[in-house]
């Protein structure tokens, strides 16, 4: 847990799971379980077709509903894509950008991640920006260099003022959906590296104010130990965000 009272953010990434009916049932189940737990923000990022149902179910609760991706253009001939303007018109405040699965399977690059980030921020959205190293980079000892370069490229031309609406999610790619988890020490070290890079870009005050999540197989068993680290300010949760009891246990660990 951070010592400077940065806002802790526990965000679920549902990925390609939950129909609208399933999302409604899940939100109705978890609403009372996380009610009153206000020491952290609780967010679920949902597939586009599920957002409206999740929003309706979450009304009156402390749960916020976000999106899992956004396109960088405001409109145009981009079949299958959704713009930040469209999302904000639907009342969506948060969006995940640059998730490792988007980079791996759909050709996202640091350049397109940067374009999407700037488009979302320009539309007034809050961005959960994902970055992290692959296994070979970790084993080669170049994790710091990789995440430093990603941070700089993904945030190119993003202003210090806009950084108020950016959350960084450090996700070691080798730990996504594998059951492997960075040790609390590895998570702390790399989140600390990201914060140092942010300080070099925006100054110490801005860097110290930014929430940095850990996102690599965080679950109900390891959350408390990870969240106890000074530079780990929350979690971006995949599999455990689909099970109300598991996600609630992570929220409890953040209290």
Role assignments for model-derived ranges:
Residues 1-255:
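Active-site loop-to-helix "anion-binding N-cap" substructures in soluble metabolic enzymes
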């Amino acid at each position: 847990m951070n010592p400077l009272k940065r806002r802790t953010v526990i965000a679920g990434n549902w990925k390609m799971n939950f129909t609208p009916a399933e999302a409604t049932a899940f939100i109705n189940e978890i609403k009372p379980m996380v009610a009153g737990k206000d020491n952290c923000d609780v967010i679920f990022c949902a597939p586009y077709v599920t957002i409206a149902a999740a929003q309706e179910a979450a009304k009156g609760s402390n749960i916020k509903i976000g999106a899992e991706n956004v396109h960088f253009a405001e409109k145009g001939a981009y079949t299958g894509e959704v713009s930040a303007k469209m999302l904000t018109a639907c009342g969506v405040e948060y969006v995940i950008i640059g998730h490792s699965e988007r980079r791996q399977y759909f050709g996202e690059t640091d350049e397109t991640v940067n374009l999407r980030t700037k488009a979302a921020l320009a539309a007034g959205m809050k961005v959960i920006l994902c970055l992290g190293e692959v296994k070979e980079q970790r084993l080669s000892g170049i994790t710091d260099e990789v995440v430093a370069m990603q941070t700089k490229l993904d945030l190119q031309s993003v202003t210090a003022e806009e950084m108020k609406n950016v959350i960084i999610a450090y996700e070691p790619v080798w730990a996504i959906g594998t059951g492997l988890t960075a040790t609390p020490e590895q998570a702390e070290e790399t989140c600390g590296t990201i914060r140092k890079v942010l300080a070099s870009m925006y100054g110490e005050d801005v860097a110290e104010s930014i929430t940095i999540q850990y996102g690599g197989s965080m679950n109900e068993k390891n959350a408390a130990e990870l969240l106890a680290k000074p530079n780990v300010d929350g979690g971006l949760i995949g599999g455990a965000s689909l099970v109300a009891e598991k996600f609630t246990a992570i929220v409890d660990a953040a209290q």
